[in-house]
Regions:
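N-terminal hydrophobic or amphipathic helices/low-complexity stretches enriched
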Residues: 19-73, 240, 247, 303-305, ...
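Second-shell loop/turn segments in exported
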Residues: 21-26, 42-52, 94, 116-120, ...
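Noncatalytic luminal/extracellular "stalk/propeptide" segments of secretory-pathway proteins
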Residues: 45-163, 270, 286-287
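Metal-dependent peptidase/peptidase-like ectodomains
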Residues: 106-107, 219-252, 363-472
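Extracellular/luminal Protease-associated
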Residues: 109-224, 230, 295, 325-328, ...
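Acidic/histidine-rich catalytic neighborhood of metal-dependent amide-processing enzymes
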Residues: 173-179, 183, 200, 316, ...
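Long, well-ordered, tryptophan-enriched scaffold segments
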Residues: 190-191, 195-199, 214, 218-287
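His/Asp/Glu-rich mid-to-C-terminal helical/loop segments that flank catalytic regions of hydrolases
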Residues: 345, 349, 466-530
């Protein structure tokens, strides 16, 4: 109890000192936007992992870090290079069909479905199909979609989603690609077909399917292989999903209606098999994380780190939309990388001396499956036990005034409490994720820190369900997310960006100055990773 009281006291002191400053104090949004304008310029060519455009962006970041007086913290100066395997589908030499009652029913790649090339797909597959509901096994809730099923030699068909009585972060964890495949593979499956629930799709299928035109990647080192035994991986268009269920006694519409109530779905064999022929083009490449250090000043705590992370990669040059082929990624995530640079610059000018050190981490390969942070978390350039927290900044969307802050991971660790204190000191309300079904908690780089036992969270400008602000966010996702229109021509709320920067900076300072490390909450599912790490 005494330790907890001391922790709260230190937090209140740090927050109180910070709250005396009129917000925003350190930022005006303009310097942040100046960084964004460089990183999201057409000259950076969309910052595809391993591309010349990304290397140019990283060179710029390193130059800015040097100007801010930060020390290199990579394995080669500011850089930590990782090896990747890139896979691209050759569609003209690939095909897909259903086989029903001995008859071939061809499917159109791109229109009906597309291959996921994150997997080293088998050249040819023909296998029976089984619908397995959400495809989840969650022992903490005594929930198992696969109970009693024999999937040996079969391909599992799943509808993305989760049952209602499973908390958001827990459901998100088990819906991660690696965890879901681990469960299916253990049951004997050789492949997986995922169907997006139209109610939770961020972008329309027409844009989602463009992913097939870009190479997927994986880390080349076998230690990172989480797709063992997966011979086939497909995404299926919800508008075409009825074809899968013909003659099964169930319709796709029926399943969607059950999923609306987040009830457990029926499981049943389908009347068709899947037949696939795949040709892949593979190549090896390298890409780097950029890492810098601001040393702390306390004799003991300077050996511990608060990590600020943001991914710098985006989608590169791709299929044109309205004549534009450059996917600039201004909000996703030049905005986050720019914020780290702006905070680094502000600390250079600040007389404030931090007790803990700050690690600025700009990761590659996020758009390819959180690969850069996955590599760093497994091979950190500092003592892994020295990292006390990760504050991840990814697509925080300052497109409406910042009145409400959404904290992903709010209830999982002390970090959530600290974020709430700092935000409220700036007159900003806080909410947990209002749409846990979108699985944002596991869809960005904080997740790899969490899996290594390090308390972590992400935050974004928030909106309440049904509000005008939420409508603006939904329109942004539909029109700009993973599209060339996420560029420098979109409306941006600079005061919102500045205030968000103040909150991130304030949270960072609170963690850096607190004599105690952030702890996982006793009832957090993710606490087990800290225990496994021996902390």
């Amino acid at each position: 109890m005494l330790k907890k009281l001391l922790h709260i006291s230190a937090l209140l002191i740090a927050t109180s000192a910070f709250s005396q400053q009129t917000a925003p104090t350190h930022f005006d949004g303009k310097s942040w936007w100046d960084y964004v304008k460089v990183l999201a310029d057409d000259n950076m060519e969309g910052r595809e992992t391993g591309s010349a455009g990304l290397r140019r962006a990283e060179t710029y970041i390193v130059d800015q870090l040097k100007q801010a007086g930060l020390q290199p913290a990579g394995t080669d100066g500011y850089y930590q290079t990782a090896k990747f395997t890139s896979r691209a589908i050759v569609e003209k030499d690939s095909s897909l069909a259903l086989v029903r009652n001995g008859k071939l029913e061809p499917l159109t790649l791109g229109e009906d479905a597309f291959f996921s090339t994150r997997v080293d797909l088998a050249p040819e597959v023909e296998a029976p199909l089984v619908f397995v509901g959400y495809g989840l096994s969650i022992p903490e809730k005594n929930y198992d979609d696969l109970a009693g099923l024999d999937l040996h030699g079969k391909v599992a068909v799943i509808l993305n989603g989760s049952p209602a009585d499973v908390p958001g972060p827990l459901a998100s964890h088990y819906q991660s690609t690696a965890e879901r495949w681990k469960t299916l593979h253990k049951a004997g499956a050789i492949g997986m077909i995922g169907i997006a629930n139209p109610a939770s799709m961020d972008i329309p299928w027409s844009r989602m399917s463009l992913a097939r035109t870009r190479p997927s990647m994986s880390l080349a080192d076998p230690e990172f292989n989480d797709t063992e035994g997966e011979k086939l991986a497909l995404y299926f268009n919800p508008a075409s999903a009825g074809k899968l269920f013909e003659g099964s006694g169930h319709s796709f519409e029926e399943l969607i209606n059950i999923a609306k109530g987040r009830k457990q779905l029926p499981r049943f064999p389908l009347t068709a098999s899947i037949k696939a022929k795949v040709k892949l083009e593979k190549k090896d490449l390298e890409s780097a994380n950029v890492i810098a250090r601001l040393p702390g000043n306390d004799a003991t705590l300077k050996n511990e780190y608060v990590v600020l992370s943001a991914h710098i990669d985006h989608l590169g040059i791709g299929e044109p939309i309205n004549g534009d082929r450059i996917y600039n990624g201004a909000m996703d995530n030049a905005s986050g990388s720019a914020l780290l640079l702006d905070i680094a610059s502000s600390l250079k000018k600040s007389p404030e001396k931090l007790n803990r050190s700050i690690l600025f981490l700009f990761v590659t390969g996020e758009e390819k499956g959180l690969l850069g942070s996955k590599y760093f978390a497994a091979h950190p350039t500092v003592d892994p036990k020295s990292m006390v927290a990760d504050i991840n900044v990814d697509m925080f969307l300052p497109i409406v005034p910042l009145k409400l802050l959404t904290v992903f991971g709010l209830a999982e660790s002390d970090l959530g409490d600290m974020a709430q204190e700092v935000a409220q000191a700036h007159g900003v309300s806080v909410q947990a994720d209002p749409e846990p079904q979108r699985n944002i908690f596991i869809r960005s780089d904080q997740y790899n820190f969490i899996r290594h036992g390090i308390p972590a969270l992400a935050m974004g400008v928030g909106a309440t369900p049904g509000s005008p602000e939420q409508k603006i966010f939904k329109e942004w996702l539909t029109q700009r997310y993973h599209a060339p229109s996420d560029d420098l021509n979109q409306p941006v709320d600079l005061p919102a960006a500045a205030l968000y920067e103040e909150v991130v900076r304030g949270l960072m300072i609170s963690v850096a100055q607190d004599p105690h490390r952030p702890q996982w909450k006793q009832d957090s599912f993710f606490r087990r990773y800290s225990q496994a790490a021996g902390e």
